[in-house]
Each structure stands twice: as structure tokens, then as C-alpha cells.
């Protein structure tokens, strides 16, 4: 079965290299969009990916690992995710799975790499899979490329740390998101 294109909240295909807000598919108490935050309740480095409780968050861009046709993002294909923002940290805005201060387990952090060039770069590969709600999707970590088995394949969900910061972590459950083009 051929993979299906990922679509935004307007039903249009999501494209590589275009800015999107990634927002909770559940409105209201489900929280807002994705942004970055430091350890504890600080906005300092290092940074992890968090869900803003109210706003649309920061713009995100998807990058293909392999050459793609028509620039369309498809379900269950390895890709890189990065924030299209400037940060005052000595790390990239690309996502990766890593340990993070104050969080037990694997956390979605910044400092990732683009493309595939060895085991370490697979920590920056995510897939987008269809979820249950209309136009909703989940992020999944399970690179198709040769990798170390140190980090298990799993979905991305929200974890409330002791400061009630909504951090993205790997878990069996999955947070459902929708994609909203920033310049609709």
C-alpha cells in the first residue's frame, strides 16, 4: 500500500520546507502548539520541545531524509523536524531524542542533525502517522535506517514535569496534533 500524504487542517498536503504550527488536535484543555523550553521552569539552555498551554507555538519545518517527489510529506516516512526560529543556545533547532534534566526516560530535545550520516543522526529521525481524530497525526520515533537499539521505537506524547511544563517524550501513548500552515 502506497503511503498517504499528510494533510494540514485545511485538507491540503503538508510540504517539506514550509512553515507550520503543530497544534493539539484537541482544542481547549488539550493545549496549544509546540515551542521550546529549558530545564525546570527556566527558559535557558539546553532546550527541549514542549507544548504551549495556549498559543500556536513556534513555526516548524519538515526536511526529507531522501530525495522526494513534489515536496509532499507522506505518512510513515523518515524525516527531520526543526523549529524555524533563532535561539540563544549552542545547539541546532532540529529535534532529536535524548536524555533531559528533570525528565525520566527519553525526551524530544533540540540539537538534532539533518539527514543520515551514521547511528547518531538516527536520533533525529521521526515519522508522522495518522491518528484517530480528523486531520490529526502523531509523531513516532523508529528510524528505518541502521541505528543503535539504545533508544526504543515509540510514540511521542506529553509529560507534565514537576513545574507543569508539557514536555514531549517517548511513550506507548501518542499525542494527536494537527498542522496549520503559518501563512494561510
From Swiss-Prot:
Which SMART domains does the record cross-reference, listed alphabetically? STI
Glycan attachment positions: 84, 90
Q: Is Kinase given among the entry's keywords?
A: no
Q: Which SUPFAM superfamilies does the protein's record reference?
A: STI-like
Cystine bridges: which residues? 45-89, 142-153
GO CC aspect terms: extracellular region
Report if keyword Secreted is assigned.
yes
- Where does the UniProt annotation locate this protein? Secreted, Extracellular space
Keywords of this entry: Disulfide bond, Glycoprotein, Protease inhibitor, Secreted, Serine protease inhibitor
Q: Which InterPro entries match?
A: Kunitz_inhibitor_STI-like_sf (IPR011065), Prot_inh_Kunz-lg (IPR002160)
Q: Which PROSITE patterns match?
A: SOYBEAN_KUNITZ
Gene Ontology MF, one: serine-type endopeptidase inhibitor activity
Primary localization: secreted
What the record says about family reads: Belongs to the protease inhibitor I3 (leguminous Kunitz-type inhibitor) family.
What is the protein's name according to its record? Latex serine proteinase inhibitor
